[in-house]
Amino acid sequence: MDDEKALLFIREEIDSIDSELISLLESRLNLSLQIGKLKKKMDKDLYDEEREAEILKKIDELALIYPKEDLKSIFMEIMKTSLNQQQ
């Protein structure tokens, strides 16, 4: 495989992963919206500092080569969006 074909192949793989990531984020947001409805029904605060800390700690445990602080920033944005959509 020449370099141009290799480049195209790798980019197609990245495009496929990007599509999967978007689908997973959509699924995550849907679940988050369900949680928001339940919390409102139970008269609980939508923001849960403990849960946020758990998620960020999990990043420390799971991230191998992706910079942990960058992943944490991404997840902070994901959680912020989830919270905004719950309101």
Model regions: which residues?
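Domain-level signature for soluble enzymes in the chorismate/prephenate branch of the shikimate pathway
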Residues: 1-87
